[in-house]
Amino acid sequence: MRFFIADDDRAVRSILRQIIEDEDLGEAAGEADDGSQVEGHMLQFKQIDILLIDLLMPGRDGIETIRQIQNTYSGKIVMISQVEAKEMVGEAYSLGIEYFIHKPINRIEIVTVLQKVKERIELEHSIGAIQHSLSRLVNRTERKARPQQKSDSGLKEAGTFLLSELGMMGEGGAHDLMAVLQYLAEHEQSEPHEKQSPSLKQIFTQVAVRKLGTGASQTEVNREMKASEQRIRRAIIHSLHHFASLGTTDFSNPKFETYASKFFDFPVVSQKMKELQSKDAKPLAPARINMKKFIHVFFLEAKLLHETMKQRRI
């Protein structure tokens, strides 16, 4: 604990300094023989915890000094004086002093008062530390609860796994689907109350703009939209062929049972299976691909898988 003593009587300053040191109350870090030498910024710089100040001093008295420093000094103040006028004592307390000690100096009284002030400071420090810890905990909780602005790497991992399960890894449209997944995740975070999914046009437009940059012309964006849609369509057809092959070989295949009916209309899968079983290489009819359904299910399954992966890691 660091003390500063302001009193025009050298003997009083010496006695107070001796008591502080003998009783291990702290350190007498500075002295002044007049209130005009006491400034709030100086006390703060010296890290003074307790200011001991006389009321009556020739230049600037204790009352006026407290008024001058009360906005810049955050430590505790104990006033020492031979003045007994209730009005002046009351004014000192109204300015925020902790105690008023009457002269002549009584060692026991000084030690008792300074111990109480010291304990109050230590208690305030403890409470402040607890409040700081709680504040950090609350902030950490809020940060965890706050949605991430960037695409979650865990969702990307889930999407990559799904592409492998769907037989689409290595296909040109796989990268486009991952870009769509990222856009849908960020769109859901920014528009949490929007019930309807974005249209395919909106999805492909935003994905194209992100890829080309905002400086791209509308012609370039339209060209990229069409190319991206075609790549994804070819990748979906490849996945359809993949599941039809699995179903033809083993109708109870776990992957076939898990994904085929989720991502495709089953009549389309059944038609593709018949084509594979037919000796005629010519398709019975063009496969009808529901791209919006596929993309929507891909997003939902990736989110579900991501949540499952997180739970397993906890």
Curated annotation (Swiss-Prot):
MF-aspect GO terms: DNA binding
GO biological process: phosphorelay signal transduction system
Signal peptide limits: none
SUPFAM superfamilies: CheY-like
Posttranslational mods: Phosphorylated by GlnK.
Main location: cytoplasm
Stored InterPro entries: CheY-like_superfamily (IPR011006), Sig_transdc_resp-reg_receiver (IPR001789), ST_Response_Regulator (IPR052048), YcbB (IPR013972)
Domain Response regulatory: 2-118
The keyword Transcription is annotated on this UniProt entry: yes
Gene Ontology cellular component terms for the protein in this record: cytoplasm
Keyword entries, A-Z: Cytoplasm, DNA-binding, Phosphoprotein, Transcription, Transcription regulation, Two-component regulatory system
Keyword Ubl conjugation: no
Record's subcellular location: Cytoplasm
Modified sites of kind 4-aspartylphosphate: 54
Pfam families, per the entry: Response_reg (PF00072), YcbB (PF08664)
UniProt miscellaneous comment: Disruption of glnL by Tn917 insertion leads to protonophore-resistance.
Function according to Swiss-Prot or TrEMBL: Member of the two-component regulatory system GlnL/GlnK that positively regulates the expression of the glsA-glnT operon in response to glutamine. GlnL binds the promoter region of glsA-glnT in vitro.
Protein name per the record: Transcriptional regulatory protein GlnL
Organism from which the protein derives: Bacillus subtilis (strain 168)
